[in-house]
Amino acid sequence: MTKIVDIKAFEVLDSRGNPTVMAEVILESGAVGSACAPSGASTGSREALELRDGDKSRYLGKGVLTAVNNINTTIKNLLVGKDALDQRALDKAMIDADGTDNKSVLGANAILAVSLAAAKAAAVAKKVPLYAHIADLNGTPGKYSMPVPMMNIINGGEHADNNVDIQEFMVQPVGAKTFAEALRIGAEIFHNLKKILHDKGLNTAVGDEGGFAPNLPSNEEALKVIIVAVEKAGYKLGEDVTLALDCASSEFYKDGQYDLAGEGKVFSSAEFSDYLADLANKYPIISIEDGKDESDWDGWADLTNKIGNKVQLVGDDLFVTNTRILKEGIEKKIANSILIKFNQIGSLSETLDAIKMAQDAGYTAVISHRSGETEDTTIADLAVATAAGQIKTGSLCRSDRVSKYNRLLRIEAELGAAAPYKGRAEFKS
């Protein structure tokens, strides 16, 4: 009854108004699963390929009809008749049919949408929540935890049209006892921050991920205004709430130097390590993502040596959810955490492999959205199913972000004590 009988694909819109792929997998039992592929703005050069049409007369060249057609023909013919419970076999069949390292023939957006839709259909057929099915696939049934949300409340870089160089300034409610309490703390900080920015005469429009995007005199000023919001909300910095950065350094790495144009400062790699180390010493920053360019492995080693014993150093563009690259990073003791994005690698099975490799090596795994999202909430189930312990899914507004938080609230209500919220203990520092 779990045999695939039909697969359909559609061109739909993401949260930025750009086309993306939705896939629907129908099983013999009548069970249906649907999923959408997300899309990134600041992307690693070694990510799996998001197949776009390039036809400038439609969606400024960003249409995905080719990827949709690949699902409705090649992938459908490949998978109809196969068992949706055998996720690894489905993913392998699509990967083999594509035949490239970066999924450039069928498109990572096509393969991923079908991969996730098949998992959802299988969960429906089994009459279990998606997180339970993913935990079964992961070989960790019943071993759940609720993730600490890393809430991006000030946006800069590629995620906003402002002069702030660092892409994300985040808060983590590590002192909360439950996910629901953590979400409330984050929301209260968010609303206090909005009032503070408004009273300063600063812009309270939001960026791609729902965070505010004001022009500020420096990156450090973003931290200072967040600290005021935390205190105004009635919480203790460093105890109830900690801070995190996503530098997205590849976006301002030029000719071997880190150019913070918004501040008019240029750093060598070693100097930028010292800059980040200084911020981590001055403020309770417990996580820094992409603190170095994806190609600056010597710089990554330097940063890891300087602060890796007390700060979680997350590789996003560095590792692109790819086990081959992650393995090399682990061997060279580069970073101590990996950001997990489905569409960087392009299938559920490969995503689970990356999480397992990280956890087995003592690295943390942070489950993440993309800046171009949809109403799809699969990452919430993934975070709980793999006991990853951390999730990045934006700020406390925009339904493309809040939908993931709301899904996590429902999961926590279902699981109760079977999915503990561990707070500060989840971080590599």
From Swiss-Prot:
GO molecular function: magnesium ion binding; phosphopyruvate hydratase activity
Gene3D superfamilies given in the database record: Enolase-like C-terminal domain (3.20.20.120), Enolase-like, N-terminal domain (3.30.390.10)
Entry keyword annotation includes Metal-binding: yes
Record key words, sorted: Cytoplasm, Glycolysis, Lyase, Magnesium, Metal-binding, Secreted
Swiss-Prot/TrEMBL catalytic activity: (2R)-2-phosphoglycerate = phosphoenolpyruvate + H2O
Main localization of the protein described in the UniProt heading: cytoplasm
Free-text cofactor note: Binds a second Mg(2+) ion via substrate during catalysis.
Family statement drawn from the similarity comment of this UniProt entry: Belongs to the enolase family.
Protein name (database record): Enolase
UniProt source species: Cellvibrio japonicus (strain Ueda107) (Pseudomonas fluorescens subsp. cellulosa)
